[in-house]
C-alpha cells in the first residue's frame, strides 16, 4: 500500500470508530454521564452492572456509571450501580482491583468467583473427548471461557435487578479487536466508545483517579501460562502508536500494517452474526 492508501484507510477507520479530532476531558465526562443517565431512564430500567478488574477502563466506566445514577436519583429517578468483582480464584493484582473499587465508590459491590464454573467447563470439554493441540491452545481457550463466565455473571445480576450491562470497550480495543467475543465484548452500552486509550486515561485523571489506576499496565490476564501479560505484547505495537493512528497522526509503516491486520482480522467481532443477506460483503 502507498502512503496515500494508508492515510485513506486511517481516515475511514477513525470515522467508523467515532474518534473526535479534539479532546476535552471535562466535556467528555459531562457528555458521557448525560448519555448514561438519559439512556437508563429511557429504558425504564433501574440498574447499571459492570465488572471491575482494577484497570483504567473499568475504573473509568464504573465511576461514570456511579455519577450517572447519582444524578438520576437527585432528579427523583430510582437508579443504582452494581460493581462486580469477578476474580478467577485469587487475582494476581487484587490490590489494584480494591483500589479501583475505592475510586468508583459503587452503590453495591458483589464478588463472584468464576473459577469453579470456568474450570468445570474445561473439564467437561476434555471429558467429551476433545483434544487440544497444545497446552498453550488449551490455556488460551480456557482464558476465553473465563471472560464469558464473567459476562454470564453480569447478565445474571442485570436480569434479576432490572439492569443493563456496561462494557468497557473503547476505540483502541475496538480497532485491535482485543476483547473476547461474547465475553467482555458482550454488553448493552459502551460509555467509553470513541476514546483512544490515552483519552480514557485523561478522563480517568480528570475524574480524580490516582496515577496507579490511570497508568496501570493494561492486561487481560486470562492466560495462566502467561500471567499478567501486557496487551502491548500481544499487539506488537504500543498503545501510544495505536492512539496516534486513531487520532490521525502519522505512524510508521509497520504500525499501519499491524493495526490494519488486526482491524481486518477482527471485523467479525464488531458485527452482528452474519446471515446470507450479509455475505459476500458489498
Curated annotation (Swiss-Prot):
InterPro entries: NAD/GMP_synthase (IPR022310), NAD_synthase (IPR003694), NH(3)-dep_NAD(+)_synth (IPR022926), Rossmann-like_a/b/a_fold (IPR014729). Pathway: Cofactor biosynthesis; NAD(+) biosynthesis; NAD(+) from deamido-NAD(+) (ammonia route): step 1/1. The keyword ATP-binding applies. The keyword Cytoplasm does not apply. It comes from the Bacteria. One of its GO terms (cellular component) is cytoplasm. Deamido-NAD(+) binds at residues 148, 181, 188, 268-269. ATP binds at residues 51-58, 168, 197, 219. Its EC number is 6.3.1.5. Keywords: ATP-binding, Ligase, Magnesium, Metal-binding, NAD, Nucleotide-binding. Mg(2+) binds at residues 57, 173. It catalyses: deamido-NAD(+) + NH4(+) + ATP = AMP + diphosphate + NAD(+) + H(+). One of its GO terms (biological process) is NAD biosynthetic process. It is an enzyme of class 6 (ligase). GO terms for molecular function: ATP binding; glutaminase activity; metal ion binding; NAD+ synthase (glutamine-hydrolyzing) activity; NAD+ synthase activity. Transmembrane segments: none annotated. Belongs to the NAD synthetase family. Homodimer. Catalyzes the ATP-dependent amidation of deamido-NAD to form NAD. Uses ammonia as a nitrogen source. This is NH(3)-dependent NAD(+) synthetase. It comes from Burkholderia cenocepacia (strain HI2424). The gene is nadE.
Amino acid at each position: 500500500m502507498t502512503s496515500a492508501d494508508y492515510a485513506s484507510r486511517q481516515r475511514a477507520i477513525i470515522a467508523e470508530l467515532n474518534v473526535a479530532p479534539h479532546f476535552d476531558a471535562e466535556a467528555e465526562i459531562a457528555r458521557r454521564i448525560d448519555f448514561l443517565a438519559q439512556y437508563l431512564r429511557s429504558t425504564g430500567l433501574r440498574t447499571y452492572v459492570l465488572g471491575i478488574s482494577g484497570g483504567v477502563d473499568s475504573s473509568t466506566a464504573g465511576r461514570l456509571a456511579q455519577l450517572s445514577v447519582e444524578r438520576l436519583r437527585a432528579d427523583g429517578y430510582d437508579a443504582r450501580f452494581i460493581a462486580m468483582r469477578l476474580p478467577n480464584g485469587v487475582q494476581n493484582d487484587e490490590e489494584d482491583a480494591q483500589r479501583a473499587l475505592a475510586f468508583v465508590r459503587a452503590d453495591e459491590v458483589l464478588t463472584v468467583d468464576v473459577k469453579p464454573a470456568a474450570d468445570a467447563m474445561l473439564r467437561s470439554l476434555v471429558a467429551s473427548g476433545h483434544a487440544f493441540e497444545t497446552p498453550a491452545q488449551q490455556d488460551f481457550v480456557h482464558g476465553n471461557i473465563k471472560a464469558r463466565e464473567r459476562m454470564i455473571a453480569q447478565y445474571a445480576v442485570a436480569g434479576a435487578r432490572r439492569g443493563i450491562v456496561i462494557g468497557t470497550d473503547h476505540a483502541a480495543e475496538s480497532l485491535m479487536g482485543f476483547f473476547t467475543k461474547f465475553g467482555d465484548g458482550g454488553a448493552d452500552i459502551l460509555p467509553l466508545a470513541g476514546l483512544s486509550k490515552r483519552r480514557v486515561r485523561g478522563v480517568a485523571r480528570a475524574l480524580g483517579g490516582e496515577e496507579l489506576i490511570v497508568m496501570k499496565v493494561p492486561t487481560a490476564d486470562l492466560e495462566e501460562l502467561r500471567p499478567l501479560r501486557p496487551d502491548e505484547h500481544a499487539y506488537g505495537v504500543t498503545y501510544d502508536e495505536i492512539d496516534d493512528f486513531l487520532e490521525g497522526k502519522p505512524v510508521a509503516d509497520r504500525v499501519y500494517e499491524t493495526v490494519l491486520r488486526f482491524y481486518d482480522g477482527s471485523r467479525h467481532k464488531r458485527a452482528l452474526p452474519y446471515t446470507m443477506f450479509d455475505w459476500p460483503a458489498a
